[in-house]
Amino acid sequence: MGDVIMKQPDGGYHVTDGSNMLGGDYHKTIRASDGTIPEEDIKRYYDIAMKLDWQDGWYSSEEMKAQAKTSGYKHIHLGGHDTKREEYEIQQDWVKEIWEKVNPGMKLLRHYLNGHGKHQSGGIHLDGWTANQYTCIVYLTPGWEPEDGGSIEFWTPNLTDEQRAMAIKTPYGLNGDESKNIVKSYWPRAGRVVLFDGRIPHVARAVETDKFRVSLVFKGTTDEIKKEEEEPVKNTSKDPFKGTSIEGKD
């Protein structure tokens, strides 16, 4: 399905990807579960994550990075791509263990770690602009309590005209409800798994104590995607330099 042009209430027009109109009302496609991962494993995964090399100054979007209204949080890229839709294999054994427990039946596009310290938060954003894209978050900080803050909020998809144009099959489309409200919110209990449609506006609110909130994030799709391409292996059987340091080189 290609682009769809829709007339807005003010008489203007907006172009949206036609795939956004597939399926039904996505704004409540949010699920959470506890007890999927044993407590002793959570502690082990957290210890592994804390020994990794974290990158500072990360933001929820390039626009938020440019504005820098809040301090950036920490981040580790673990695999996959932001711009390419290719299925790939997870390289970290401990992450594979988690994915095997929480995979809702989607093909993985990207996975990474986010880390938020005291007073660090994200910004309201979307993870995807087309149908059939989902995000799965696993919270890994042991001993997290409600008073530690850091809850994730999910908002009505009407915060911008672009979101409203995309939300044509929800109650919040261009001619729908303009009230901006939180749909659901979850605190980051250790081991909690949260799954949601990538088109839902969401934000990780600030941590209130000295604890460090570690979130393992998986982004995937239920669409068919191609496998990650491997570098072709050259046939060097007739290479005159076979057995030397320049075998197979152009």
What are these regions (language model features)?
Residues K96, E100-V233:
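Catalytic core of non-heme Fe(II) oxygenases with the double-stranded beta-helix
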Residues W54-W58, G143-W144, K219, D250:
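Tryptophan-centered motif/residue detector
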Residues G2-G105, P232-N235, F241:
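Non-heme Fe(II)/2-oxoglutarate
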Residues K238-D250:
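Long, low-complexity, intrinsically disordered segments
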Residues K7, H14-D17, G72, H111, ...:
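Intrinsic disorder/low-complexity signature
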